């Protein structure tokens, strides 16, 4: 950084400290704010808390300051909710007041400042985008239309694994093949397209760009520049990379998928009774003037991030827990063999006949919640919560992982025990009927992808367990389940090698 920029930064910092001190004193007299660590001017609690706002760190603060606490991170107020009653207030009772999404410098780049559905503010644009996306993505009709494709994709995984010599000896990193499966599951829905192999050049390019987007957006590295505007010049290089990745991704979506589908529609007569893929519905909305081309591309962006990777994380966590708990794996396999018959492959309708499979999925989503803080909420205007004043445009984090892992609400929560959903938690479902358990959120801004994720999880875990014995690699009794948290993600740190021994029927 040159001396002139450094001088300007220091002068700005000095002025900001004076202004922040005055504003802080005025605001403290006016508001009854939630408890939290004592902030300092300009930096707030950032010097104490740091950039790593993962679910476990926030849980420790909840133990110290209570179920509702405030972190002042530079210019941003972060309000953290850690009880079922307060979660109900934010997500349901005051769902409109807290129904918006926060903005940050990186997500503004990747979403075109909220031109998508997931990260836009609550209002007319969100309602329009949700309506346009529901029919092609989030209905039971979609599940029935594409379940055969999902079953084919996991069957292909099983057959490919059986052909890999290493799979039943030293083991393989199964995630690589499952990633191809998940891309095919979602690209069938979006574009009626699939990739033939992991070596497909277009798949390799797409996967690399999506991976870089996830890394940049989920990293805690940029928090300091987002929280404290005076430090934002230090983020110039980071934000430049974000813009480059965004432009490359949107160009790839447009050139290879959206425009290709348009050409197909223009060159061959489309049967009006034929089943449409999602992009057909979305392009119709564009033709009617309901959305523009940028909105179309940001819808594709959302699905690439929100639908593919999150479900893949949950599949990977489920496999890891089954490897590390062989008695649970055996119990699940026995259920499938008993209910369906040995060798009869699990289909989507079968998953509803397999209660232990459903319990394994629920327990995976409880202990290893893919989005442990949900997607952050925001109140556009001043609000009340738990008897406290919440300043306008506060970032509201619901620590859904702690709701589902708090020993005050769950019996031995650190234990992976699917049986709890037959016993003391038999009435708890993943759809948000109990505010202790919100893997997909609940209310207006809940994740509509639940309708796709649950059947895909069921088919995938069911087929793998019935066709293979899943084991740690030679010399290990368990695989490593160390967590890697992100801005609001939770996935496994190391993509483990596992041994898959084929079963004979």
From Swiss-Prot:
Q: What class of enzyme is it?
A: oxidoreductase
Task: Name the Enzyme Commission number(s) assigned to this protein.
Answer: 1.14.14.91
List the CDD domains hit by this protein, alphabetically. Answer: CYP73 (cd11074)
Q: Which residues cross the membrane?
A: none
- The lineage's top-level taxon is Eukaryota
The pathway entry for this protein reads as: Phenylpropanoid metabolism; trans-4-coumarate biosynthesis; trans-4-coumarate from trans-cinnamate: step 1/1
**Could you tell me what this protein is called?**
Trans-cinnamate 4-monooxygenase C4H2
**What gene does this protein come from?**
C4H2
